[in-house]
Amino acid sequence: MSDLKAQDSLRDFDVRTTFVFNDYPLRGSLVNLSQAWRDVLRPHPSWPRAAADTLGRFLAATVLMAGSLKFKGELKTQISGSGYLNMLSAVATSDGTCRGTLSVDDSMPIGPEGARDLGALVGRDTPIVIALLTDKAAPYLGVAPIEGGDAADALANYLARSEQVDSALSLAADDSRIAGLLLQKMPDAKSDEGDGAEIEAIKAMARSAMPEELLQTPAPALLRRLFGEYDLTALRQDPIVFRCSCGREKAAAGVVAMGLEGARELLDERGGIEVRCDNCLETYLFDEKDVDNLFRRPAR
């Protein structure tokens, strides 16, 4: 494996490793997040395991997909459904940060199939929405139905349908790590006619990665184990950390969105307005003076 022999220069965890196959038109990304995932989970000890693991797999996939795009901004994967897991949001930014949140409907028992079947967990008619948000252009939205039994199948189908990118994806999550491996055929790349079978074999190897392998094996060792017979070049490693995007300015915008009448009703009922971040649970307080300042019209 070409440049990957210099393993001492590659970090093992909390990074996204991007690599290419030198003899085939394939690029890949591998991510294994430990500290970042624990930071996502820390404010939410009551999240049910099946729901948290599903968020973890989608967050790993979102970090992988963000690494293959050329943009300045953030990529968001969102599900809003009618099942037990009725909301999921996973975000990765071009700056190497990630965050995620979820909500569940406790009135809908998960059932034995829910932990294994994504459709059973979120609702059969629920679509996946992928949003690319930048400060340079209007948001791009991609929508695809949930097909396949798990997050990896559903997102690979999304990439094939909405992005027309031939992909192989493996994902894993537990209460201390999340991990993922994404292989994609390079668009418009030329290859020999005989390469097709070999490319399919490589993709099958990627899909065969067991959850324990993805979660516990350092990046260089995992690439060696899966693709040791191929010539690979590691292009870069990007550190990934948890970082919430909340702040008082964003919270204030939420108060303004209520409208003056709605804000004053809350003030009358509760004596103040609390805006809580879904990701980190930071709470921002606004009193009557704050509300007056937010809705004060600029002098003419």
Residue map of PLM features:
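Interaction interfaces in information-processing and related assembly proteins
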Residues: S2-R236
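Cys/His-clustered metal-coordination modules, chiefly Zn-binding fingers
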Residues: A206-R300
